[in-house]
Amino acid sequence: MNFVFPSLNRLTAVAALSAALLGGCASMASAPAMVSNGVLTGPNGMTLYTFDKDAAGSGKSVCNGPCAANWPPLMAADTDKASGDYSIVTRDDGKKQWAMKGKPLYYWVKDTKPGDMTGDGFNKVWQVAKP
């Protein structure tokens, strides 16, 4: 205990508690997707898809390069934290991507407005993502 400045101990405790509470808030993230009309949509309102060739729970995406140019991944920031049915996979380029129930999530470049689902069933391997 600091006998010269007793209020310093109280100030130190308050500062430590504040830092702990604020630090916890910084790591909280809202869900990376929303449900609209029974399908998952990204923060921009656009439909999200899963790729049948991605193995659920593998921790990676097999849609890279030209595939990812047509099916852009729903990217996660390095500071994002997964919770619930959401997880984060690491792409071949080292960047992070959101996944739902272990399946990486993607947009389709030919969807032009929220509510479009033109990629559903594409090549019989792309499906709208559902909760």
Residue ranges and their predicted role:
Residues G24-C25:
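N-terminal Sec signal peptide cleavage junction
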Residues D52-G57, K110-P114:
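Acidic glycine-/aspartate-rich tracts in secreted/extracellular proteins
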Residues N44-D52, S58, P66:
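Short N-proximal segments of mature Sec-exported proteins
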Residues N2-A15:
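Bacterial N-terminal signal peptides that target proteins for export
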